[in-house]
């Protein structure tokens, strides 16, 4: 097995003490079988007490990726359950939130954190770009595709491929899939109806991510921000981007 994804891992057991004891033992067994196997936990909030090198390797990166990027680019909560105008386009708030949450990671954990825009638990990022509060039961399936803005999704993909962490594309996002939160976010792949332009854009950004090492393991620096814009850099000893 090359990797383990742990569902709500912090909730295992009846006490925090038991939880940590279990995951320490779990890591010993996993790494003995395969030293390179990754241990990836689903976790909301501060993960630092589990990321000390003897339990999890990293987490699904909600706090230092999915949530702040969604708030900044769309103003929406990741389930499409609310819109907050004070977040929308607020570059300074975005940087402050990101850097606070990134500080909870060890560097090696941040570099491999699972950076998603969408997944099986939350609304599709493209649907969030319509800035409509709702779910499948209240709005219906068709509304998930109304007034969406693919240009905002493309902005998000650029950030996904250049931000610290491991970019992880939820199936169909690259093809322009929409959907409200679970279960509507699990629609069938749109065979024959893919957005090929968007697919090619994803391929181009993935090539850039792979080509330049600074995007995979380089340092990060926020440079400037304003209303609906930000500027940041990635760099290592050989390259700045």
Where are the model-predicted features located?
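Active-site groove signature of glycoside hydrolases
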Residues: 1-15
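Surface-exposed helix-capping loop/turn segments at secondary-structure junctions
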Residues: 2, 34-36, 166, 210-219
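Acidic-and-aromatic substrate-binding clefts and catalytic sites of carbohydrate-active enzymes
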Residues: 12-21, 47-48
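Short, contiguous acidic/charged loop-to-helix segments that flank catalytic cores in large enzymes
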Residues: 13-14, 142-148, 189-196
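Acyl/amide activation-and-transfer machinery of modular secondary-metabolite enzymes
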Residues: 182-189
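Active-site beta-strand termini and strand-to-loop segments that position acidic
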Residues: 232-239
